[in-house]
Amino acid sequence: MSRLSPVNQARWARFRHNRRGYWSLWIFLVLFGLSLCSELIANDKPLLVRYDGSWYFPLLKNYSESDFGGPLASQADYQDPWLKQRLENNGWVLWAPIRFGATSINFATNKPFPSPPSRQNWLGTDANGGDVLARILYGTRISVLFGLMLTLCSSVMGVLAGALQGYYGGKVDLWGQRFIEVWSGMPTLFLIILLSSVVQPNFWWLLAITVLFGWMSLVGVVRAEFLRTRNFDYIRAAQALGVSDRSIILRHMLPNAMVATLTFLPFILCSSITTLTSLDFLGFGLPLGSPSLGELLLQGKNNLQAPWLGITAFLSVAILLSLLIFIGEAVRDAFDPNKAV
């Protein structure tokens, strides 16, 4: 903390003073960290195998059944009772706490899908027999990574467009504003539905489409800040000394605009996660079978006789978005110099 400037130290103190936002940040980081380690927490493959004096790492490498003394050269099925017994008799196996992956199906249960919570499936199974907790972990990772990438890409494009409009003004600003007015009126959802009938949606395809239509949220904030600061004396002096426009924008004007921009980022991230969840809920998101919070919400709606699906999905989304909103409020207070610690 000693390396921070006095201004940033005061901002950090104001952020920590907001206890709700401060602890929400830590809880969010812990949950996101757990989701990044989903393969170590929920997996239908062993993490480590000791067999006949040799070490095997199924999490990192695919082994055939013949590697463990089986008759077939096909990929080993670690849920096969015969292979399980053989591994236990000739060595030992380290399993993940949850023995189901994102696409695993619990064939051992004698209850119809979706089945209620049990010792095997702590939060029950979905309509396809997948473990709900495992799909929540993997779905949270996909949602947050999608949100972070969408927030980063759209923020860069929005800041760049707002900076150019605000700095140059005139026709650049006029035509830029007219273009944004037209572009923001495009029916994004209908375009996604139309394109989904032609192209199979995937993570990168959805990210590109949402970035293409979602970069305008920061343009107005950055543009207003550049319009305000471009007539300041130090900017005029830099222009008179022959400093390049690029240097003036990046070194002298952008840092001031970023103060307002940073306060919006947690809310943009929240909106980005909601976008993917909504598309998955409507059936125009990730491919069928992908772990997704929106897809689990859809299953909860379609299976009202299995309330654990809807309740689990709703709580997961609500907690995630609430944490981000609390963080955003704390960041906003931290950058407000009128807030007392």
Swiss-Prot record:
Bilayer topology annotation: Multi-pass membrane protein
Subcellular location: Cell inner membrane
Keyword entries, A-Z: Cell inner membrane, Cell membrane, Membrane, Transmembrane, Transmembrane helix, Transport
Biological processes, Gene Ontology terms: microcin transport; oligopeptide transmembrane transport; peptide transport
Listed name of the protein: Inner membrane ABC transporter permease protein YejE
Parts of the chain on the Cytoplasmic side: 1-21, 165-178, 223-252, 329-341
Function of the molecule: Probably part of a binding-protein-dependent transport system. Probably responsible for the translocation of the substrate across the membrane.
Similarity comment: Belongs to the binding-protein-dependent transport system permease family. OppBC subfamily.
Periplasmic-facing ranges: 43-143, 200-201, 274-307
GO cellular component terms, semicolon-separated: ATP-binding cassette (ABC) transporter complex, substrate-binding subunit-containing; membrane; plasma membrane
Keyword Heme: no
Record InterPro entries: MetI-like, MetI-like_sf
Residue span, ABC transmembrane type-1 domain: 140-332
TM region positions: 22-42, 144-164, 179-199, 202-222, 253-273, 308-328
